C-alpha cells in the first residue's frame, strides 16, 4: 500500500473540492482515508492514504492525463 493521488484509467486525478468526496472514493478503492489536496501538483486532487498497490495512481512524472 502507498499514499498517492488516486487516478482513473486515463491517468487523470480525481478532482475535488471537499474532503468527504475523496474519503468516499479512496475508501471504496481500499484506502484507509484521504483528503482533498488543494492547489497541489495536479490542482485540487484526492490524496489517498494506504491505497492498495493494485489501484491506479497518478504517475509522477508519468504520462499526462489523456
Curated annotation (Swiss-Prot):
Keywords: Disulfide bond, Ion channel impairing toxin, Neurotoxin, Secreted, Toxin, Voltage-gated sodium channel impairing toxin. It comes from the Eukaryota. Pfam families: Toxin_3. GO terms for biological process: defense response. Belongs to the long (4 C-C) scorpion toxin superfamily. Sodium channel inhibitor family. Alpha subfamily. Expressed by the venom gland. Residues 2-66 form the LCN-type CS-alpha/beta domain. Has the structural arrangement of an alpha-helix connected to antiparallel beta-sheets by disulfide bonds (CS-alpha/beta). One of its GO terms (cellular component) is extracellular region. This is Toxin BeM14. Disulfide bonds join 12-65, 16-36, 22-46, 26-48. It is found in: Secreted. The keyword Metal-binding does not apply. Alpha toxins bind voltage-independently at site-3 of sodium channels (Nav) and inhibit the inactivation of the activated channels, thereby blocking neuronal transmission. Has paralytic activity in mice. GO terms for molecular function: sodium channel inhibitor activity; toxin activity.
Amino acid at each position: 500500500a502507498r499514499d498517492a493521488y488516486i487516478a482513473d484509467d486515463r491517468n487523470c486525478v480525481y478532482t475535488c473540492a471537499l474532503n468527504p468526496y475523496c474519503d468516499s472514493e479512496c475508501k471504496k478503492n481500499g484506502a484507509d482515508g484521504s483528503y482533498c489536496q488543494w492547489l497541489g501538483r495536479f490542482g485540487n486532487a484526492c490524496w489517498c492514504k494506504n491505497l492498495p498497490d493494485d489501484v491506479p495512481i497518478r504517475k509522477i512524472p508519468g504520462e499526462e492525463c489523456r
